[in-house]
């Protein structure tokens, strides 16, 4: 397999384009603090935060595929590329409405490899969390703000993991899935970055 094919496979398996949802709040908060110009912005903390958030998001995406296949949810979803009630103009683009990456079903990765990849992303996000912890201590001389940010990151991790993982499986509990997505991509990312 060529290098470009491997990149495309990685993008498909991880659903990398969807990480823009987690990057947007981080970039907004970073831009705000950078514009203030009163030493509240640290480029090193900002970069570490971006990578940590990306790794958490990718881990949640891959866990989502893992648990959806394991529980038979993806198999039951026959309207994977259903454009639903979209206007005719948008139907032409065959927008993905639901169903994850379908990477396991397409043979791009197997179920065990999916779990390993998700665990690897989460492990790496913890490593970045430690770097953020240390970097913030070097800048401020205090662990106070870092403990709050890491707590928020941990809550985000739990929401991402239990979005489709049993026994909680938020995505199938009448509105709790939507609430968890709102919390993870709204207040938690914004507060965690700040």
Spans of features found by a protein language model:
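Membrane-interface elements of multi-pass transporters and channels
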Residues: 34-39, 66-70, 74, 138, ...
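Aspartate-rich (DDxxD/NDxxD/DxxxD) Mg2+/diphosphate-binding motifs
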Residues: 56, 60-121
């Amino acid at each position: 397999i060529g290098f470009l094919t491997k990149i495309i496979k990685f993008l498909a398996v991880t659903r990398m384009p969807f990480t823009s949802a987690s990057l947007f709040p981080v970039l907004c908060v970073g831009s705000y603090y950078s514009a203030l110009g009163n030493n509240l912005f640290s480029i090193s903390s900002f970069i570490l935060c971006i990578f940590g958030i990306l790794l958490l998001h990718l881990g949640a995406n891959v866990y989502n595929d893992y648990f959806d296949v394991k529980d038979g949810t993806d198999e039951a979803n026959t309207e994977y590329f259903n454009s639903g009630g979209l206007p005719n103009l948008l139907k032409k683009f065959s927008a993905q409405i639901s169903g994850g990456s379908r990477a396991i079903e397409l043979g791009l990765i197997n179920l065990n490899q999916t779990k390993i990849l998700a665990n690897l992303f989460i492990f790496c996000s913890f490593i970045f969390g430690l770097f953020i912890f240390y970097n913030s201590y070097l800048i401020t001389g205090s662990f106070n703000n870092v403990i709050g940010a890491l707590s928020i990151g941990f809550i985000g991790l739990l929401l991402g993991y239990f979005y489709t993982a049993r026994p909680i499986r938020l995505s199938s509990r009448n509105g709790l899935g939507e609430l968890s997505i709102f919390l993870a991509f709204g207040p938690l990312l914004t507060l965690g970055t700040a």
